[in-house]
Curated annotation (Swiss-Prot):
Lineage: Bacteria, Bacillati, Actinomycetota, Actinomycetes, Mycobacteriales
Summary of the function given for this chain in its UniProt record: Functions in the biosynthesis of branched-chain amino acids. Catalyzes the dehydration of (2R,3R)-2,3-dihydroxy-3-methylpentanoate (2,3-dihydroxy-3-methylvalerate) into 2-oxo-3-methylpentanoate (2-oxo-3-methylvalerate) and of (2R)-2,3-dihydroxy-3-methylbutanoate (2,3-dihydroxyisovalerate) into 2-oxo-3-methylbutanoate (2-oxoisovalerate), the penultimate precursor to L-isoleucine and L-valine, respectively.
Catalytic activity: (2R)-2,3-dihydroxy-3-methylbutanoate = 3-methyl-2-oxobutanoate + H2O; (2R,3R)-2,3-dihydroxy-3-methylpentanoate = (S)-3-methyl-2-oxopentanoate + H2O
Cofactor(s) for this UniProt protein: [2Fe-2S] cluster; Mg(2+)
Organism of provenance: Corynebacterium efficiens (strain DSM 44549 / YS-314 / AJ 12310 / JCM 11189 / NBRC 100395)
One GO biological process term: L-valine biosynthetic process
UniProt xrefs under Gene3D superfamilies: IlvD/EDD C-terminal domain-like (3.50.30.80)
One Gene Ontology cellular component: cytosol
Molecular functions per Gene Ontology: 2 iron, 2 sulfur cluster binding; dihydroxy-acid dehydratase activity; magnesium ion binding
Transmembrane regions listed in the UniProt entry: none
Protein name per its UniProtKB record: Dihydroxy-acid dehydratase 1
Pfam family, one: ILVD_EDD_N
PTM annotation (N6-carboxylysine): residues: K124
EC annotation from Swiss-Prot or TrEMBL: 4.2.1.9
Length: 613
């Protein structure tokens, strides 16, 4: 047997003081010596994806206790990227991932917890907890708060907006054809319930990827926050983590640990899923970071290779009118993985927190397998309630039928793929020798080749001003630099610029290029993660107005039409300037906390993780 980590605080004379304190938290005599399971919650009233989680920890705790564990709950912080968007608050979003990971490590190691159930949901919370799980390598199960229901259709000035979501509201705000009353109607419909925003944005993308990594249960990524079916996921998470404890501590079975589950092959499967479902570009940052935390040899080159052979099987908002509730009706993540598996695109020799092998759990949970269990079929009938609410488990609505249309439905078969390439593409060239990323699933294929003159700005705020003041012209490439992990600092999301371009009618007429990043809600020719970033001496810092930029998604090229000699001349001039590799006219207050992150942050090709050594 492997001794419980918590034994140092619960067993023996030397632990008398710690036991006295444990008793003061409600620990009973017969609980000493049992595995302590940290219920890592993230409840907050600031974030709709987390507002319903206050009592969810109790559900998990009851299940842990019934299975023979000792539950102890704590909370992490949670930043709402949508509320933080478009102002200085967005500087804090990506760095909060590191704070969350550190806080989980601090709490779990300081109190010698034996295992964790991570109750996450929104953009940086799942990645932060995932980084912590890979770092700590103790038994863990992830269970998210679940996606929000899509908003109901609204008609504004004769134009239907159906169904609505956060991106609909932001785009409408920049559309001169939508008056204030129309905008109010859209925003009142856009976010009707608790849960992570309803499209295949960053939060839902990451929660889906935990299924493919093997660290969460089937349905985790797609079962609505409001549906009663989600309660069972929390209960099963509590039961499952205690079983993992028994396997690891009681049977010395290291296959129960996250690093044994989320191996390189599992990371490859997760990114194959990401390509197939057209996930957020932010997932690349977070998957690279998690791999580094778990000492998994998985990098941008691996992602590039996968994107060349895995097709895009599903287009979900912001790239279509489908939302997560539609993905769920089509069989959720098991259905997408099942299609990939039948196409020979998954590694089969992987296991999960609930199953010993991929084939058996896909047989049971893929509604297209012909062998799906009644439990699986029942789960994927869970439908939205259509009632505004902040309460979890508040609806029992059911779909009349499942979406099994592999040609025209929400999830296509490989034979009917949207594109032969994956929904995420890595571009390289003299602008981004270390890579840049674009969500190709959000772009009409006729726009996959684009050439235009650069319009250079040095902040997101300036980019928004250029768009809303209508000084950007069709055919231009808007270059937003010094917004990378170090240069921002914090690598702001450019949701407002992309949404405002779309709302201004330029979404298919301009490109946007940045060393920052994009929201999962961004679409169009939005190229982010340019590496090296400007603050690290990247070529993006040398681009001048009027320089010709070529984007070729088919050939994965991002090129600046400037000679090497001219770039060297510009580089020499930049390095001889008073403030080399810094924005020249930007007014931005940067706090001590953000400056600390900036000093350690790597460029996006490394996951924007902190480099300490």
């Amino acid at each position: 047997m492997i001794p419980l980590r918590s034994k140092v605080t619960t067993v023996g004379r030397n632990a008398a003081g710690a036991r006295a304190l444990w008793r003061a938290t409600g620990t009973k005599e017969n609980e000493f010596g049992k595995p302590i399971v940290a219920i890592v919650n993230s409840y907050t009233q600031f974030v709709p994806g987390h507002v319903h989680l206050k009592n969810v920890g109790d559900i998990v705790a009851d299940a842990v206790r019934a299975a023979g564990g000792v539950p102890k709950e704590f909370n992490t912080i949670a930043v709402d990227d949508g509320i933080a968007m478009g102002h200085g608050g967005m500087l804090y979003s990506l760095p909060s991932r590191e704070i969350i990971a550190d806080s989980v490590e601090y709490m779990v190691n300081a109190h010698t917890a034996d295992a964790m159930v991570c109750i996450s949901n929104c953009d940086k919370i799942t990645p932060g907890m995932l980084n912590a799980a890979m770092r700590l390598n103790i038994p863990v199960v992830f269970v998210s708060g679940g996606p929000m229901e899509a908003g109901k259709a609204v008609v504004v000035d004769g134009v239907a907006h159906a169904p609505t979501d956060l991106i609909t509201a932001i785009s409408a705000s920049a559309n001169d054809g939508v008056d204030d009353a129309g905008l109010l109607a859209v925003e009142q419909s856009a976010c009707p319930t608790c849960g992570s925003c309803s499209g295949m944005f960053t939060a839902n993308s990451m929660n889906c990827l935990t299924e493919a990594l093997g660290l969460s249960l089937p349905g985790n990524g797609s079962t609505l926050a409001t549906h009663s079916a989600r309660r069972a996921l929390f209960e099963k998470a509590g039961e499952t983590v205690v079983k993992l404890c028994e396997r690891y501590y009681g049977q010395e079975d290291e296959s129960a640990l996250p690093r044994s589950i989320a191996t390189k092959k599992a990371f490859e499967n997760a990114m194959a899923l990401d390509m197939a479902m057209g996930g957020s570009t932010n997932t690349i940052l977070h998957i690279l970071a998690a791999a580094q935390e778990g000492e998994v040899d998985f990098d941008l080159a691996d992602i590039d290779a996968l994107s060349k052979r895995v097709p895009c099987l599903s287009k979900v908002a912001p790239n279509s009118d489908y939302h997560m509730e539609d993905v769920h009706r089509a069989g959720g993540i098991p259905a997408i993985l099942g299609e990939l598996n039948r196409g020979g695109l998954l590694n089969k020799d992987v296991h999960s927190v609930f199953s010993d092998d991929l084939e058996s759990w896909l047989d049971e949970w893929d509604i297209r397998s012909g062998k799906a269990s009644e439990e699986a079929i029942d789960l994927f009938h869970a439908a939205p309630g259509g009632i505004r609410t902040t309460e979890a488990f508040s609806t029992d609505n059911r779909w009349d039928s499942l979406d099994t249309d592999a040609e025209n439905g929400c999830i296509h078969s490989i034979e009917h793929a949207h594109t032969a390439d994956g929904g995420l593409v890595v571009l390289r060239g003299n602008i981004a020798p270390d890579g840049a990323v674009i969500k190709s699933a959000g772009i009409d294929e006729e726009l996959w080749t684009f050439t235009g003159p650069a319009r250079v700005v040095e902040s997101q705020e300036e980019a928004v001003s250029v768009i809303l003041n209508k000084t950007i012209q069709a055919g231009e490439v808007l270059v937003v630099r010094y917004e990378g992990p170090s240069g921002g600092p914090g690598m702001q999301e450019m949701l407002h610029p992309t949404a405002f371009l779309k709302g201004s009618g330029l979404g298919k007429k301009c490109a946007l290029l940045t060393d920052g990043r994009f929201s999962g809600g961004s679409s169009g020719l939005s190229i982010g993660h340019v590496s090296p970033e400007a603050a690290h001496g990247g070529v993006i810092g040398l681009i001048e107005d009027g320089d010709i930029i070529t984007i070729d998604i088919h050939n994965r090229v991002l090129d600046l039409g400037v000679s090497d000699e001219e770039l060297e001349r510009r580089r020499a001039a930049e390095e001889a300037s008073d403030k080399p590799w810094q924005p020249k006219n930007r007014q931005r207050v940067v706090s001590k906390a953000l400056r600390a992150y900036a000093k350690m942050a790597t460029s996006a090709d490394k996951g924007a993780v902190r480099q300490i050594d």
